[in-house]
């Protein structure tokens, strides 16, 4: 049987998203919203711009705007004009969003611990090299 790593990777990513969505749903979140809260929670000292979120999650400005607007409506974060550049939006968790940081980070840590227990850190690091290869591909590179 021929292996197709890209296909397996895509299937695994879908399954991982389904699992994250299932966890996030109990807090009226999507997996993407959960990931953004986790990202903002880990960068507490930094001033986060919408542009930083776009780069971190490899999404377009319009997609980021839509996601962040929905999170604003839910009272999870607020966006405001950056002090140093009026064209940029700063993003900050509200108290409601901050309440979810611990739950989300514990969930993410437990997922990582399960992975490490099952495969060991060496195999995970090797797999991360494969993932990094895919992340660095651009366009029609072979």
Language-model segments: residues:
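Alpha-helical DNA-recognition elements
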Residues: 22, 70, 133
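N-terminal leader segment of winged-helix/HTH proteins
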Residues: 1-27
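N-terminal helix-turn-helix DNA-binding core of bacterial DNA-binding proteins
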Residues: 18-60
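Charged, amphipathic alpha-helical coiled-coil/dimerization segments
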Residues: 69-129
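Alpha-helical linker/hinge and terminal dimerization helices associated
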Residues: 9-12, 16-19, 57, 100, ...
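Short, hydrophobic-biased segments on the C-terminal half of alpha helices
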Residues: 50, 68-69
């Amino acid at each position: 049987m021929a292996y197709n790593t890209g296909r397996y990777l895509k299937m695994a990513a879908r399954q991982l998203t389904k699992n994250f969505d299932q966890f996030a749903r109990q807090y009226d979140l999507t997996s993407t919203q959960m990931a953004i809260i986790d990202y903002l929670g880990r960068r507490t000292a930094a001033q986060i711009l919408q542009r930083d979120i776009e780069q971190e999650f490899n999404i377009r400005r319009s997609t980021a705007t839509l996601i962040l607007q929905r999170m604003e409506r839910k009272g999870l974060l607020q966006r405001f004009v950056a002090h140093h550049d009026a064209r940029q939006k700063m993003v900050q968790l509200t108290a409601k969003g901050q309440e979810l940081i611990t739950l989300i980070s514990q969930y993410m840590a437990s997922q990582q611990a399960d992975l490490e227990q099952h495969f060991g850190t060496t195999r995970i690091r090797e797999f991360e090299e494969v993932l990094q290869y895919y992340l660095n591909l651009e366009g029609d590179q072979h």
